[in-house]
């Protein structure tokens, strides 16, 4: 096989599958829930495979990543990134329809922005 003469990404799919399964087995064996961060691959099919192997849900760093994953059918998303501003709150409101969404809050400003959203069960450690 000749290689392209420009930069490209090559993924050994068998090795990737082996690594995903091995990590999930290890975590399962130690009673650790896996909620992988999709920022490393940003590919809904890989996130779906992680769920099929036993991940509890996915983590997205940005609202746009969460929107892409939800549109692809992934419905349990954790968004640890603080959302500030009405435009992002409205995008979050639209995203919440039909999925389980968890967010973090680390300031009063963020909490005030989220206060207008329909909330389910809140967990406060």
Where are these regions (language model features)?
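Generic N-terminal amphipathic, Lys/Arg-enriched alpha-helix
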Residues: 1-11
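A generic structural signal for short
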Residues: 11-12, 34-35, 54
